[in-house]
Structures are given as structure tokens and as C-alpha cells.
A protein has these predicted regions:
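Cytoplasmic membrane-interface "Motif A"-like loop-to-helix N-cap segments
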Residues: 36-48
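Helix-to-loop junctions at the C-terminal end of transmembrane segments
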Residues: 26-39, 126
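Multi-pass alpha-helical transporter architecture, strongest
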Residues: 139-169
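Intracellular juxtamembrane helix-capping segments at the cytosolic ends
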Residues: 82-96
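Short amphipathic helix-loop junctions that connect adjacent transmembrane helices
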Residues: 1-13
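A membrane-interface helix-boundary motif in multi-pass transporters
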Residues: 124-142
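Loop-to-transmembrane helix entry/capping segments in MFS-fold secondary transporters
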Residues: 97-107
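C-terminal ends and interior cores of transmembrane alpha-helices
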Residues: 49-63
């Protein structure tokens, strides 16, 4: 928000609205895409889009065309939706029925730890080098997220046999263990 105001001379509310509106529009289509190509590939595509958005945003200035700025904020929103819609279901797919809570705890611990640490680290970098390091910093870490996703071997979509698909009395474990 401070970056948008001080560096880009944009209303930070508008930049967030653009990103959030794009994410909201993307949530359902992203779910359908993941159903076709898989969650891992969809997340990787989202990480690439987010890295591109952050990488391009690192070169934006107050003199950059508003359309380009808005496009990057929209791309970031779509990318974030692409990642978020698929991440938690992947975690649930990794867990057996009784371990869903444990895996949910791991997921949120890692996610929240990053949300606590990165403002401090990026803040230190911005204090030392200026606000212009924010988007390159973000691009580097989203690029690293891409690398870590390459090592993910499980948690993608599982086909549910047709005879089980309509059975509402079955547990998640019964549906996923053939």
C-alpha cells in the first residue's frame, strides 16, 4: 500500500481492488482448469504468472502506463487465486482421513510463518536499499516457490470411480483408497 502510494503514485485501495476483483473472477475457472490438467500444473502456472507480475512490477514507475500497472495487479490476483484454490486441496489429498487436521496444521503453520517473516525481511531490505526492492524480492521468492513445487510428488487430483461418486455415505478415505 505504501509502495503503491509512494512509488507508483496510485491509490493503494484501487490496486488491491483490481487484484481482488481479478482473483474473484478467476476462482471458479481455475478450479475447472485444475480438474482438467491437475493441481500441480495449475499451481505451477499460477506461480509463473505471479513471478512475471512481480518481475514486471519491479520495473514500473509512476510514469508507467496505468493500463500496464492495472494489468500486472490483475495478473497477480489471478495468479494468487490459481495458487490458493489448489494448495489446500492438495494438502487434504495428501492426508488420510484421520490426518487431515494435522496436515492442515502444517499447511497453515508454514503459510502463516511466511506471512510473519516476509514483512520483516522485506522491510529490512527496503530500509537498507529503498522501496524499489519489494517486487524483485517477491519475484525471487515466487521463483523459489516454483522450484519447491517441482519436488511435489503427491496431492494431485484423484479420480473417483463412477460407482463411488454418488455415494454420500462414504468417507473421504473410502473414496480415495481403491
Amino acid at each position: 500500500s505504501v509502495y503503491a502510494s509512494n512509488i507508483l503514485h496510485k491509490d493503494y485501495n484501487l490496486t488491491l481492488i483490481i487484484a481482488q476483483a481479478a482473483a474473484i473472477v478467476a476462482y471458479l475457472p481455475v478450479g475447472f482448469v485444475a480438474g482438467r490438467i491437475g493441481r500441480k500444473k495449475t499451481i505451477l502456472a499460477g506461480v509463473v504468472m505471479l513471478t512475471v507480475a512481480f518481475g514486471v512490477a519491479g520495473f514500473l514507475t509512476a510514469d508507467s502506463p496505468s493500463a500496464l500497472m492495472n494489468a500486472m495487479f490483475a495478473l497477480a490476483g489471478i495468479a494468487w487465486a490459481t495458487i490458493n484454490v489448489n494448495s489446500f486441496p492438495m494438502v487434504v489429498e495428501l492426508a488420510s482421513g484421520g490426518d487431515v487436521g494435522k496436515y492442515t496444521g502444517f499447511y497453515y503453520t508454514a503459510s502463516m510463518a511466511a506471512q510473519v517473516a516476509t514483512p520483516m525481511v522485506s522491510g529490512l531490505l527496503m530500509d537498507k536499499f529503498g522501496m524499489h526492492v519489494l517486487f524483485p524480492y517477491a519475484a525471487v521468492f515466487t521463483g523459489l516457490a516454483f522450484v519447491t513445487m517441482l519436488f511435489v510428488k503427491h496431492g494431485d487430483n484423484r479420480d473417483i470411480p463412477a460407482e463411488k461418486a454418488g455415494d454420500t455415505d462414504m468417507t473421504v478415505e473410502e473414496l480415495t483408497n481403491d
